[in-house]
């Protein structure tokens, strides 16, 4: 008899709780309105982060600067697994990341074209987000190599020409790496490099710009 009474009290308590939650939810949703839009509003200004300025179209979503958010919990754990796994150690096993005679570190190098920035984009971001001193130092080795490769006319990086036309795909990817590095460091050299490089690009005739298949299909 005592067990039946306890069971009835438990059921009544559960029903009462569900009823209260339902009433609260109904009251809340009744006072709210739902508006469907094709895309997020871009009229308002984000005071914390800079979006594109005119004449460029404002961004619907603003990418947060690398390192502005510190990961915790399982996200941090997975990033640490990347650091301790292939991403963090690819330089030890990849022929393309071999520093000796690498085209990003040595003028006239014979390897390491787009493969280096493909890897460095993720590796550098991982270093900044985890604030890992060893990885940051490795990243800066390559970034300093980029700065050292700058030429008086604004060009930077490996020189790879086909029929008098320079292949620019590797530089296009490295610009992403430099963007992340600037977000992390605010190093003015990044702005100077990009400004000079884009001025150089403006001097390239249209029939010689992005003519290679690989960069033309993506650039």
Tell where the protein language model's regions lie, with residue ranges.
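Glycan-recognition and catalytic cores of secretory/periplasmic carbohydrate-active enzymes
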Residues: 17-18, 28-219
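N-terminal export/targeting leaders of redox proteins
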Residues: 11, 25-28
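Bacterial N-terminal signal peptides
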Residues: 13-23
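Bacterial N-terminal signal peptides that target proteins for export
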Residues: 2-14
């Amino acid at each position: 008899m005592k067990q039946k009474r306890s069971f009835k009290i438990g059921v009544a308590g559960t029903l009462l709780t569900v009823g209260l939650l339902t009433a609260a939810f109904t009251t809340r949703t009744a006072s709210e309105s739902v508006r469907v839009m094709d895309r997020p509003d871009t009229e308002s200004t984000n005071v914390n982060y800079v979006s594109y300025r005119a004449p460029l179209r404002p961004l619907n979503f603003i990418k947060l600067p690398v390192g502005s958010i510190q990961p915790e919990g399982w996200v941090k754990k997975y990033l640490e697994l990347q650091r301790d796994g292939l991403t963090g150690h690819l330089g030890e096993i990849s022929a393309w990341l071999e520093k000796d005679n690498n085209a990003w570190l040595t003028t006239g190098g014979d390897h390491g074209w787009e493969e280096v920035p493909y890897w460095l984009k993720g590796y550098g971001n991982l270093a900044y987000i985890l604030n890992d001193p060893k990885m940051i130092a490795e990243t800066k080795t390559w970034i300093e190599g980029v700065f050292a490769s700058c030429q008086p006319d604004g060009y930077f990086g490996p020189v790879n020409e086909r029929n008098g036309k320079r292949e620019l795909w590797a530089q296009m990817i490295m610009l992403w790496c430099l963007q992340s590095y600037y977000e992390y460091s605010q190093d003015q050299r990044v702005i100077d490099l990009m400004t000079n490089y884009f001025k150089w690009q403006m001097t390239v005739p249209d029939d010689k710009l992005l003519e290679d298949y690989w960069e033309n299909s993506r650039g």
